[in-house]
From Swiss-Prot:
GO cellular component: a single term: cytoplasm
Organism expressing this protein natively: Saccharolobus islandicus (strain L.S.2.15 / Lassen #1) (Sulfolobus islandicus)
Protein name as annotated: Proteasome subunit alpha
Principal subcellular localisation of the protein: cytoplasm
Record's subcellular location: Cytoplasm
UniProt KW Secreted keyword: no
Length: 241
């Protein structure tokens, strides 16, 4: 995204709107999200699934050390696309919110409240000088009292509930795939397969998903627990694609 000299004053200041109603630094934060690895969230009647790709950014990097699906509390998890350091900070914040809620109220935090709390922090960083927006979008999913919940938060602080959502480099292709193939009455197994198929659709023709290049988290309405899938289980589902 490029702007001419007339726009430079609005470009430098985070708190000043341009004449066309834009906050350019927030727009740039959205561009950072589009450069991130693709992550997909799907909600069905049987539960929720988050699937995210992992790539080796450097040849000597230990890919096993890369984490792309995160447990926030027993019933909720998340993934992100964008700046990894920004994602880590917001995930730690979400975990603290969940922990404080358990300590004070002796019950799991609602996913609605958790998402709003994270989105509020993001929004605050769009209206104060001396800071910059978070260059990251989060997919938050889990089970609230046997009800599946799925949200996505944007760098602007906006958050919305979704049936299915994609973020990152392949969001456009994945969204098109999900719009054509999504069904609400999927089993949790079929929801996992749909997420993997949507993620596969974003790859180049000579690429394919492997247990080392994808992370999957899921929660079913039967257990209410958000779990990360093992390599053995990932391999089993990938063989069904």
């Amino acid at each position: 995204m490029a702007f001419g000299p007339a726009a430079m004053g609005y470009d430098r200041a985070i708190t000043i709107f341009s004449p066309d109603g834009s906050l350019y630094q927030v727009d740039y934060a959205f561009e950072a999200v589009k450069k991130g690895w693709t992550a997909i969230g799907i909600k069905s009647k049987s539960g929720v699934v988050i699937a995210s790709e992992k790539r080796k950014a450097q040849s000597l990097l230990d890919v096993d050390s890369i984490e792309k699906v995160f447990l926030i509390d027993d019933h909720v998890g998340c993934s992100f696309a964008g700046l990894a350091s920004d994602g880590r900070v917001l995930i730690d914040y979400a975990r603290n919110i969940a922990l404080q809620h358990r300590l004070i109220y002796d019950e799991p935090v609602s996913i609605d409240y958790l998402t709003k709390s994270v989105a509020d922090v993001k929004q605050m960083y769009t209206q104060h000088g001396g800071v910059r927006p978070f260059g990251v979008a989060l997919v938050i999913a889990g089970i609230d009292k046997s009800v599946p919940k799925l949200y996505m938060t944007e760098p602007s602080g906006q958050y919305m509930p979704y049936q299915a959502v994609a973020i990152g480099q392949g969001y456009y292709t994945a969204t098109e795939f999900l719009e054509k193939n999504y069904k609400e009455d999927l089993t949790i197994e079929d929801t996992i397969l749909l997420a993997l198929k949507a993620l596969s659709a974003t790859l180049k023709p000579n690429e394919k998903l492997t247990p080392n290049t994808v992370e999957i988290g899921y929660a079913s309405t039967q257990t209410g627990l958000f779990l990360k899938m093992t390599s053995e289980d990932k391999n089993m589902y990938l063989q069904k694609l």
